[in-house]
Amino acid sequence: MKFGVTLSNRGVLVGLCTTSDLLKLADAVEASPLMDSVWCGDALFVNRRLDALTLLAAVAGRTERVLLGPACMGSFGLRDPMVFAYEWASLDVISNGRTRLVACAGGGAGPLWEAETAAMGINPDDRRKHMVENMHVLRHLWTKDNAPFEGRFVKFSNITLEPKPIQNPCPIWLATNAERLSTGQADSGGSEFALTRVGKIADGWMTHSVSPGGFRRSWDFILKVGSDQGRDMSGFDHVLYHHINVNGDKDAALADSKTFLDLYYTANYSKERLEAWLTYGTPRDCIEHLQRYKAAGCNRVTFRISTMGDPMTQLKRVTEEVLPFV
């Protein structure tokens, strides 16, 4: 398996860490032979945090090896795709071709989400449609010069974007989940359509809060969709977005993670919700839990270090006591 760390860029706003802490954590990932990627969350006006693009650019400037991406780009459907295409292409150049863009629709229920969407001039019902069209805009600008584009929301002609990304094609993954929505509620039927979209148009897949069995079923479904479309899925990649807390006392590990995640997301997570999103307990507990995902075909995991303690100390335990034995 391959492993990465998801930086807690919202933590800077809620007093859980400093910007320096995040960059030191990225340095530690770069230095670890067991890890190969650095990720960070993304949102605009709900679940506010340091801007993902800016933070990833900062990490790119001090690393040479690790892959870089959002987990996931929740604001993707809200951003101007022409400007974003330019920004992401620049990040790919700065990082020497190490980016993994993970698009997702983002959003949720409630007045704050509605206000965010309205402020960006987008109909909430069209958020996913914007996401898909934005993917097409990015690919168009990254691979063509002076070619017209005629979409539902975006239209242009005689536009050439430079710099182009170093990667050709520059990968765009999609984030979706077959078992839970981002709110943690049981999915009501849209997941099969979302997984079909991954298999048809994405270059990779990110998921979270999914059981090993659910991961296997979703992964097989995506690969079949892609193959049925005539796509070569041999290089199609994925990542499980997860949390981890290593502690000799399993109950203490769960309590520590709950305190962290409740503060981080301004929530009150149930034990069931936490256990869907978290590897925790003794090193042996964590090893066995991750081995179940490995047996289900999961070959890449990115962890948020979910502790109220020192994340560097926790990362040391993860890399020394858990990952070598998975």
Predicted feature descriptions by range:
Residues 50-73, 130-134, 316-326:
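Alpha-helix-loop-beta-strand connector modules within alpha/beta enzyme cores
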Residues 37-62, 74-75, 107, 209-215, ...:
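Glycine-rich, proline-tolerant flexible connector loops at the mouths of alpha/beta enzymes
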Residues 16-31, 84-87, 180-197, 282-292:
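Short, acidic/polar
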Residues 3-7, 36-40, 68-71, 99-103, ...:
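Hydrophobic faces of well-ordered beta-strands that scaffold small-molecule active sites
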Residues 3, 59, 91, 138, ...:
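Conserved, mostly hydrophobic/aromatic
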Residues 1-67, 125, 168-171, 181-188:
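N-terminal beta1-alpha1-beta2 module of alpha/beta enzyme domains
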